A protein has these predicted regions:
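Conserved Walker B catalytic segment
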Residues: 156-184, 193
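Secondary-structure boundary motif
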Residues: 148-151, 180, 224
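Charged, glycine-rich active-site and insertion segments that engage polyanionic ligands
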Residues: 2-49, 55-57, 65-69, 183-186, ...
């Protein structure tokens, strides 16, 4: 995968190429950002540029043997670790990434490196609640693989996707090698939630923060995917919030029904909160708990967006709000109840609930606490 294959991120791509050209390659790097920002794809493109024999114009050639092998995730000096699991796993059964490498390569090729953790778990057929993880035995395998000499490239590279899914034992096992790796060994950690990593791991890495994709880049991408109306393309780029995966859902119409469901949940929550309907709020929480974990987190993201848009309406800066239709109608009426005194606590409560859901917290308990907390905050103006 070449830098040219990455959507947007021109400044970061240029910076990464310059560090390689100048010989400033840190042995342990932590790429952080959502999947839709291109974090995994960018990490692979970086490794490909590092190993390419015929770099030109700030990019890999894409044609030499190293480039072709890395693009296929099949280079002998590129080792991959990612969260895995399976239905019906027996007690004590050891599951490693290598067993699922063909599926991972296929998904990476199909989606050009842009796919979410949930899409990977769906490919593994893990169901609604089962998630992948990186176990302690996987850490042993990391150390074993990196103890060998490189086959072809100058560097041996260990790329760990979603290191936050490591259990504590696995994380502790790789600390030593992160701090004092073998010569010409490169660690690339690709994380969506670096705050869930051990601080001792984060402190041993150089962070590469992958930002949201610029709205104008997503707008052009919407046009390229067949959106003809400039206003619709602009609104989609705004709603995607820097995330190429979300833009794809919007263009395909896949987000419409889900966004409507999230909007209805949001309206119900705010109306019940304003009227202090505590028993009904408990029922609301039970309904929200029936969604899949990915849908629950999606609802919380939409709730944060609607609260921010309502706050902008409250502050009188309608010109930078991209609401329309029933969302605009509701938020215009709701805006007086979202001000400077409660917007930050409300967003903090959403972020806390989202983190608890991501960590497999009981959704009924999480949403009950969330709903009752929101009820207290709505009137605090």
């Amino acid at each position: 995968m070449r830098f040219a294959d990455i959507t947007g991120q021109d400044d970061l791509k240029r910076h990464l190429a310059q560090t390689v050209d100048a010989g400033r390659v840190s042995h342990a790097q932590l790429f952080t950002g959502a999947s839709g920002f291109g974090t995994l794809a960018l990490a692979v493109a970086y490794v490909q540029y590092l190993c390419c024999r015929y770099r030109r114009n700030g990019d890999s050639c894409g044609e030499c043997p190293d480039c072709r092998q890395i693009e296929a995730l099949a280079h002998p000096d590129l080792h991959l670790v990612f969260p895995v699991n399976k239905q019906g796993k027996k007690s004590g059964e050891v599951i490693r990434s290598d067993e699922f490498l063909p599926q991972f390569r296929t998904l990476f090729a199909e989606r050009r490196g842009y796919f979410s953790p949930q899409e990977w778990y769906d490919r593994l057929d893990l169901g609604k609640t089962l998630k992948g993880m990186i176990a302690a035995r996987e850490a042993d395998e990391i150390i074993r693989k990196l103890s060998f000499k490189s086959f072809e490239a100058d560097y041996k590279t260990m790329l760990v996707w979603l290191p936050e899914t490591m259990n504590e034992e696995a994380a502790n096992k790789i600390l030593k090698i992160l701090e004092e790796p073998w010569e010409r060994t490169l660690f690339i950690l690709v994380s969506e939630h670096p705050d869930r990593l051990l601080p001792t791991i984060v402190s041993r890495t150089q962070e590469v923060c992958v930002p949201r994709i610029a709205p104008e880049v997503l707008e052009r991408e919407a046009f390229a995917r067949g959106v003809a109306d400039p206003l619709q393309a602009r609104n989609m780029a705004r709603l995607a919030d820097g995330d190429l995966l979300e833009l794809g859902h919007l263009v395909a119409g896949e987000s419409d029904a889900q966004r409507k469901e999230h909007f209805d949940l949001f309206c119900s929550l705010m109306r019940l909160s304003y009227n202090d309907k505590h028993l009904e709020l408990v029922t609301w929480a039970e309904d929200a708990a029936q969604l899949s974990r990915e849908q629950q987190r999606g609802f919380l993201r939409d709730a944060a967006r609607l609260l921010r848009e309502s706050y902008m309406l409250h502050a009188g800066i309608r010109e930078i709000s991209y609401l329309w239709g029933e969302e605009l109608a509701f938020c215009t009426k709701f805006a007086p109840f979202v001000g400077s005194q409660n917007i930050e606590p409300l967003i903090a409560e959403i972020e806390s609930a989202s983190a608890q859901i991501a960590q497999n917290g009981n959704p009924t308990i999480v949403f009950t606490h969330f709903a009752l907390s929101v009820s207290k905050m709505i009137k605090h103006l």
